[in-house]
Amino acid sequence: MPSRVAPAMVAVLGLAVALGAAPRCVADEAASPPRAGSPFKLPPAVAHKGAIASAYPLATEAGQEILAKGGNAFDAAVAVSAALAVVEPSSSGLGGGGFYLLHRQSDGYETMLDAREKAPAAATRDMYLDKAGNPIPNASTDGSLAAAIPGEPAAFEYLARKYGKLPLKVSLQPAIRIAREGFSMYPRLLGSLRYKRDRMLKSPDTAKVFLTPDGNVPELGYIIKEPDLANTLEAIANEGAKGFYGGRIAQELVDGVRATGGIWTLADLASYKVIERKPLVGDYHGARIVSASPPSSGGVAVLDALNILSGFDLQAVDSGTRKHLVIEAMRRAYRDRALYLGDPDFVSMPLAQLINPDYAAGQRSSIRADKAMPSDMLPGIESQPVGMQTTHFSVLDSEGNLVAGTISLNLFFGIGYIPPKTGVLLNNTMDDFSIKPGTPNAFGLVGNAANAIAPNKRSLSSMAPTFVETKKGLMIIGTPGGSYIISMVLLGTLDYMDGKSAADIVADGRYHHQYLPDVVDYEKGALAESELAQLRGMGHTLKEGDRRWGNMEVITWDYTSGKVQAASDPRGDGEGLVY
C-alpha cells in the first residue's frame, strides 16, 4: 500500500490553513520532465500513483484507495466526494452540488462539470418576498422551501461513466464502508454541530445521526454512524443516478420535503442533469489560468482581478501598496460579479468582455496607487458574514489527469434537515439567488436580475476550482469560504506566481473586499500594523475577522525538479498525500 504523507506535509485537495500553524500535510515527490502537446505540458507519468488533498484524512485516503485499485483521478474524485459527504456533513453531501474542473491528459481535453443545484419547477421569482415586496427573514435559508434540487449524486455517475476507469460501485465503496462502520467526532465538526444543534433538534432523523439520544452534541471521539446514508449510497452504487433521482429514495426525499413546507416533485428529481461547460481560460504574466465558468462566478472574478493586476508591477511596490492594489482589483471584480453574472442557460452575460485585457485596462485606469475608491463611486447597484460551509479537494494521478472539485450544501449542514430513511442532509442553496436586487444574501453578497429565481435555474456561486500553469510548473487550487472563495483563490494564485511553496500558499494570511459592503475584512495577523496604518491612510475601512477563513487544498508540481507537493490548509482537519 502507498505510504501516507506525514502530518507535516502538504496536501493536494483543497484544505484550509490556520494562521500561525504549519500545513497539516506536505508531501514531496519527484516526477519525470514535462512534455509538450496538450494545453498543460504535463509529463506522461507522475511519481508513484499521484497526489490528493481534501478536508479530512478519511476522504483523502478513500481517493488513495481507489487510485491503488487502478482508478484514475476522476474515479478518485468520486470516492473523495462521497467520503466527504459522510465525514464532513457540514460542508457537502448528496443533498448538495458543486463544480468539477477536469483535465484529461491523454488528449488535453478540459471541461467543467456543472453539478450545481437547480431551483424546483414550482419556484417563482418572488417566493421569498412578503406582500410588500420585502424579503421574509430566513425564508431562503431555513426550512425545506430553501432547498434546491441536488446535483452531486448525478455527478458521481457522470464522472465514473464518462471519465473514470472503474465501476461506480467500486469508487463508492470507501464511503459506504465509513458510513456503516462510523468515524470519530473531530473538533471542527464538533464546533459546527454546536452552532446548529437547535436546528437539528427539529429534525428527528438529523438528531438521530449527529446528536446523542438526550439531544446533546457528542464529545470528541464519539463514533458517528450513518446507516441510512450508507443505504442511499448503496442504491446509487447499484443503480447509478436513478438510485437517487428515482425509486424509493426519490419518493422519500419528495415526501419529506413537501411534509415540511417544500415544493419538490418527483419530476424535479428525474429531470436533473449534469451539464458540461467550457472552462474559462486566461493569462497572467505568462501563466495559463483555467477556472470555473458560470453559473460559478469564481473563475470570471478571479480572471477579471488578475487582468486588472497584470498592469501593475506588484514586486516593485511596498507591501501596503501591493495589498491596496489587490483590494481595488477585488472591489471591481466583485462589482462585475454582482452586476452581470447568472445561469448561462437563462441570461446573456458579457463574459468575453469581463475577461478581456482591454476591459481590465479601463478598470485599472480608475485605480489610484495612493487612495481607495469608495464602492459607491463605481457604477453599480444599490445596496446596503464567512465560513467553511463548502469543501474543496484536488487530485493529480499518475497519468497526469487533474481534478479540482468544489462542492457544497451552502450554509453549515444546509437546512439541517434529513428526510426520513434517506440519510441525506438538504442544501439551502436557494439563498444564492438574488432574492431581491440589492439585498445581500447570507454571505453579504448582492445581486441583480441576472441571478433572479426562475424554475429549473441554477444560482450563481463563488466556487472557483482552478488550475494554474507556468513554464516551470503547475498548481491545482480551491477552497471553501462562500463569497471569500474568489479572494482566497486570487491570493493563492499571486502567491504561486511569487514562487511560494504549496505549504506557504495554504498557510498565508488572507484579506478580502467584495464591493459591498465597502469594507476590507482580514484575518488576525494577515496585515502588519504598518500595512493597516497605510491602508487606513488611503481611505480603506478595515475589519479584523473573528475567525479564520477557508480550508484551502493545493497541489503543486515543479517541472524542473519533478517535485510534487500536496498541501492541506492548517485551518482545517484535512490531509494531503503524495504516493
Model-derived features: where do they sit?
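Bacterial N-terminal signal peptides that target proteins for export
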Residues: M1-A11
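Short beta-strand scaffold segments in enzyme catalytic cores
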Residues: S92, G97-R104, T391-V395, P465-V468, ...
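Bacterial N-terminal signal peptides
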Residues: M9-G20
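Extended C-terminal subregions enriched in glycine
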Residues: K457, V489, M497-R547
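Short, small/polar residue-rich loop motifs at catalytic or cofactor-binding pockets
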Residues: E276, G387-T390, F412, S461-M463, ...
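Active-site rim segments in enzyme catalytic domains, especially the processed small/beta chain
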Residues: V86-G93, G97-M112, I263-T265, L402-K471
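Internal maturation/activation junctions in enzymes
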Residues: F312-L409, K421-T422, P437, V446, ...
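Noncatalytic scaffold domains of N-terminal-nucleophile
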Residues: D28-E61, E65, A73-G240, F244-G246, ...
